[in-house]
Amino acid sequence: NLILSFSGERSQFVRFNNALVRQTGLVDDADLGLKFISNGRTCSAGYTVSGNFDLDLKRGLDEINRMRQESSEIPEDPFLVMPTTSDSSRKVIQANGLSFEDSVDAILPAVSGIDFVGILANGKMYRGNANNLGQQHWFETESFCLDYSLVTLSNQMVKGCYAGSDWNQS
């Protein structure tokens, strides 16, 4: 039996200080986990997906071959529970989020002239799971979180957080 688990994100992070952008970055990352089960024995592997299909396929096949060999050399897994159904699910949460290109322009005009400090995390996260019994599960969501502080002239702070899936500019 083979179980595949996928996790990934495509997200943006922007750090603000004194109502100016101090740091920004994009994350485009995905990982694949493999679990090989044979004769009550369990082996696991995982790697970061490169996006190059041929390279990623070769790495996956190499790991499966390694786990096949390793599974004959390890003791049985006393906690092994095998899936018994082939149920599948798919949930994709669409959002009217903040595009990466528009994020800074959406925030800076509203905080101009204010001592605004914070971080924006914005983007999509993915999770998937499949096995050779036919189970397939996929979850995808888009969200944002703007965690910020407003600093007064006397150095007092008001903390706030604006988070969700649909950005409301008003």
Residue ranges and their predicted role:
Residues 6, 36, 120, 150-152:
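Hydrophobic side chains in beta-strands
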Residues 43-45, 51-83, 114, 141-170:
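Internal alpha/beta scaffold segment
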Residues 2-13, 55-139:
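Acidic low-complexity segments
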Residues 19, 31, 118, 123, ...:
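Glycine-centered flexibility motif
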Residues 13, 29-33, 42, 132-136, ...:
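Broad gene-expression machinery/nucleic-acid interaction feature
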Residues 12-69:
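N-terminal alpha-helical targeting/anchoring segments
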